[in-house]
Structures are given as structure tokens and as C-alpha cells.
Amino acid sequence: MGVFNYEAETPSVIPAARLFKSYVLDGDKLIPKVAPQVISSVENVGGNGGPGTIKNITFAEGIPFKFVKERVDEVDNANFKYNYTVIEGDVLGDKLEKVSHELKIVAAPGGGSIVKISSKFHAKGYHEVNAEKMKGAKEMAEKLLRAVESYLLAHTAEYN
């Protein structure tokens, strides 16, 4: 089994604490609201939101995937860190066993933040991971982040 790493950094004008609170801690409710064209629903099927929690995420029509099942691995409120693993779903196809993500939001000069994501694509057997698949995951995450960011800019009193 090979492991393929992908890292990305995305700047945001939203301060780290506010972005973590909205995008991560309340993301299950907020993201389907602000990006229904991407995510139609997030359902907690086990756990209290902390490590071990299992979530079913259903994609909107028009997205090439139907659903994923994620396991929360770590939530660190003090350091704005969130780790989770995609453990099921058609996004994995027949070549991936799982995809682990480490997300950290850090303060940026000027009051904004930087969202750092490190992803590990765990291939089944000797399969290689298509670079387009990794790029597609980054683009979807950025689209969701921008939707949350736009919402927060329009609703300045929320998530403070």
C-alpha cells in the first residue's frame, strides 16, 4: 500500500478563531446552508463530535460523488486543529483505502488566517493516486472555505 501526500495552504481574511468555530466546529450545519450546490447534508451517525465521531456527508446533484463517511480523529480547540479520515464512499473508488486529512488554521498578519491542509491518500495495493484526484479534493475544500468566508463577511455578528 502506498501513501501519497498532498499539502495546501489557503489564505482567508477571516480571523483564525472565527473561521475554526464556523468552518470546523459548526461546519456540519453551516456548510450545507452556504454551499448546497456542493454538500446537501451532513449527518452525525455516531459520537458527540469529538474523536471517534462518524459522519455521513451527502453531495449535491451534479457533484461526481454521492457520499463519503468520515471519522473524526482529533479536535483541538486551543490550537485550531481538526483531523479526520474519509473511511467510506464512492470518492475512494477501487484504488483508495482511505484519505486522512490534518487541518490547522493559523493566524496571518493583518488579522486574517491561513488554512493549512495536509492530506494522505492511502492507496490499495500498488495503485498510484491520480494527481487530478488530489487537486480535485483541494478545489472542493477551497470552494467550501470560500462559501463559509463569504457568509461570515455578510454576517459579521455571527461566530464571534
Swiss-Prot record:
Stated consequence of mutating V38A: In isoform 1B
Keywords associated with the record: Allergen, Pathogenesis-related protein, Plant defense
GO biological process, one term: abscisic acid-activated signaling pathway
Cellular component aspect of the GO annotation: cytoplasm; nucleus
UniProt xrefs under Gene3D superfamilies: 3.30.530.20
Signal sequence bounds: none
Recorded GO MF terms: abscisic acid binding; protein phosphatase inhibitor activity; signaling receptor activity
Outcome, altering I63S: In isoform 1B
PROSITE patterns in UniProt: PATHOGENESIS_BETVI
CDD domains membership: Bet_v1-like
Protein family: Belongs to the BetVI family.
Extra remark: The sequence shown is that of isoform 1A.
Protein's name according to its UniProt entry: Major pollen allergen Car b 1 isoforms 1A and 1B
Organism: Carpinus betulus
